[in-house]
């Protein structure tokens, strides 16, 4: 399986490979076009902790995948809650806040694309 050619971002969530055992698999989660660079981050936030991010330059995007817990991303006029095992893509050229309002440590992967 190869990544589809996309002009815009896409949540794909497609099984790309399955091993002989059920636990062995690769899932293609999302795709975004990139002009320059992609960053891969791991994050963890303790219960009640938050991180306020400054707006990135126009054209920057983030792909989030939650490993454990539940991540809330607060934007100026809205919020998005992402459960463990789910992905979310957003333009990061706005101010936003990562929030762990759950009852366990939050762990997630963050890709920054620009």
Language model segments and positions:
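Structural motif
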Residues: 63, 70-72, 79, 95, ...
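A short, N-terminal "cap"/entry segment at the start of jelly-roll beta-barrel domains
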Residues: 1-37
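Short acidic-glycine-tyrosine-enriched beta hairpin
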Residues: 76-93
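A short hydrophobic beta-strand segment most commonly corresponding to one strand
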Residues: 42, 89, 103-114
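Short, conserved beta-strand element in jelly-roll/cupin
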Residues: 42-45, 56-73
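A short beta-loop-beta micro-motif enriched in histidine and acidic residues
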Residues: 34-38, 49-62
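Asparagine-centered strand-capping/turn motif at beta-strand->loop junctions
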Residues: 98-101
């Amino acid at each position: 399986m190869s990544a589809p050619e996309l002009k815009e971002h896409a949540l794909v969530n497609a099984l790309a490979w399955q091993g002989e055992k059920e636990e062995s698999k690769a899932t293609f989660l999302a795709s975004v076009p990139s002009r320059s660079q992609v960053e891969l981050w791991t994050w963890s936030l303790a219960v009640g902790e938050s991180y306020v991010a400054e707006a990135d330059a126009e054209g920057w995007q983030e792909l989030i995948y939650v490993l454990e817990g539940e991540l809330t991303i607060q934007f100026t006029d809205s919020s998005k809650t992402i459960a463990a095992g789910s992905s979310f893509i957003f333009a990061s050229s706005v101010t936003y806040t990562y929030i762990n309002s759950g009852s366990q440590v939050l762990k997630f992967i963050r890709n920054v694309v620009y």
